[in-house]
Amino acid sequence: MTLLGPDAYLDHIRTESARFADVLATCPPDARVPSCPDWTAADLVAHLSGVQHFWTGIIAGRPVAPVDEDAEGRAPLASYDDELARFRSTHDTFVATLAAADPAEPAWSWSGPDDQKVAFTYRRQAHEALIHRLDAELAAGQVTPLPAALATDGVHEALDVMYGGLPDWGRFTPGEHVVEYRMTDTATSIWTRLGTFAGTSPEGKVYADEPDQHVVADPGTAPALVVAATASDLDAWLWHRGDDARVAISGDDAVRALVTGLLGQSID
């Protein structure tokens, strides 16, 4: 499939971040976030604020890698209103920094070798803002559909990057079964091939014949399993924010069980 362009991603970062802040402004700070049960609304706004602050530093300092890849947290502020104000200010700085950067320039990311460019941040942060906008809406009881074009891209990103990323120290051995993820409203399908993963991480952890799946081109053969929904519902579902009843799954029972296990892992 054709990915969105950097201008589209930047527009979505702006739009989804604005909706995120506007919705959270209607919530009490202790409102629970159903999709992140350990979080309150205050935790959610602090999280996305920290994420956008972190990636501002990555883009401003490109291509240097961060000293601490997990350093997204910042000291809490005195009030919820202060946190919301800091988010809006942080967001403005992030967007300005990203807009001034050429997507083709080298920049660190936690993803694979092909994603060590500014373009990765454009795309990843559009989806980060989108999914956390949904979290905010769930907390406020004000859920709206995800934009179809961004959600279609989001299904691909979830399957290809979040679930299907392949580190350079690992190897994927393809199996016989293919799964089709079909978006009924955008006439788009994404296929994954099931297989196994093996390798030894830099920390010395050994993986042997772990079930895995990776995005492939349309194989031109019948899939063993079809997962179908609108782009909005499928993207939300892959991120564990959606309703199972809004996703239709048909095909081989054993393949379904395997895919259910693969998609059950946390990608937050």
Residue ranges and their predicted role:
Residues 1-7, 48-109, 143-155:
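Short, helix-capping/interhelical loops that line the mouth of catalytic, cofactor-
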Residues 9-16, 47, 83-90, 121, ...:
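Amphipathic alpha-helix face/heptad-repeat signature
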Residues 14-26:
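First transmembrane helix
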Residues 39-41:
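Helix-turn-helix
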